[in-house]
């Protein structure tokens, strides 16, 4: 009987500790330079870039500006980094980025392929996040 009561109390405590108000995901506010993003949904910004490539900057603004970092890079469905370890600079044949404070400078290299390229960047993480989708035209 005591075991059942203890189990019931444990379940109730677990359920009460899960609050959607405490677990609200908040989009990081960004200022952009050199690229025009459109809002896809509350957390996702999307942009089209030319085949020739582009250079642009993102700067975290507002209350959660200090949460700005690139935590995930996916290109055409392939993860490029270890998402568990935010890094301040990264490069590959696709281009590069470098972070300085709350600003991240990106360079997207020319697309030499015959297919469009899809870049997906996760900025921030946890409860403070912004997803970027960049679609690059094909050659």
Give each language-model segment a name.
Residues 102-112:
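Short, hydrophobic beta-strand segments
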Residues 24-25, 33-35, 104, 126-139:
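C-terminal edge beta-strand
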Residues 2-8:
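Sec-dependent signal peptide recognition
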Residues 19-22:
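Bacterial signal peptide processing site
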Residues 14-17:
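C-terminal motif of bacterial Sec signal peptides marking the signal peptidase cleavage site
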Residues 51-103:
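Surface-exposed binding patches on compact interaction domains or structured appendages
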């Amino acid at each position: 009987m005591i075991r059942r009561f203890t189990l019931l109390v444990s379940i109730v405590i677990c359920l009460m500790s899960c609050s959607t108000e405490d677990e609200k995901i908040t989009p990081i506010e960004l200022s952009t330079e050199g690229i025009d993003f459109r809002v896809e949904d509350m957390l996702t910004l999307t942009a089209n870039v030319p085949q020739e490539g582009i250079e642009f900057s993102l700067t975290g603004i507002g209350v959660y500006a200090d949460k700005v970092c690139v935590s995930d890079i996916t290109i055409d469905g392939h993860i490029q980094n270890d998402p568990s370890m935010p890094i301040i600079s990264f490069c590959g044949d696709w281009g590069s980025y470098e972070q300085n404070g709350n600003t991240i400078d990106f360079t997207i290299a020319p697309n030499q392929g015959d297919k469009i390229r899809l870049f997906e960047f996760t900025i921030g993480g946890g409860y403070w996040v912004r997803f970027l989708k960049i679609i690059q035209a094909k050659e």
